[in-house]
Amino acid sequence: MTEWDGLRTASEHQTATTAKRDGMDRQTVGSTNRGRLSVEVRTEGRSEILTAAGELDHHTAELLRVPLDEALEQGRSRLVIDCSQLEFCDSTGLNVLLGARLKADAAGGGVHLAAMRPVVARVFEITGADAVFGVHTTLQDALAE
């Protein structure tokens, strides 16, 4: 199991990417996202399960994007996002998931969202994004499909 907690490579990558975009050198790795989102990754059967806990927004999106991209690069195209601990998702987080869906679909897989809390599910309902993902009530349902 791998955990992306804002203290490892994904955080360093996000800080470097942010610094390149806005020209600021913050000199503090992960300072904008430390502790706000963690992502645990594990493989079960033919599924790569990513458990996101915390807030998925423009400050933390890279912490999910990196392990999603790594899974796809390693040929694991059936991605299951366990959203049971995800407390918030903004448009940047939604775009990370939509981007992963396009890549996974192109590779013959897909992205399945499991156990979304009502506040997170509402973002997907309002935007219509729930129609393009496999949305499941529980993680077990997502894995069984």
Language-model regions: role of each:
Residues 44-46, 84, 116, 140:
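Conserved catalytic submotifs in the C-terminal HATPase_c
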Residues 46, 129-132, 138:
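Glycine-centered tight turns that cap/initiate beta-strands
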Residues 137-145:
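A charged, well-structured terminal subsegment
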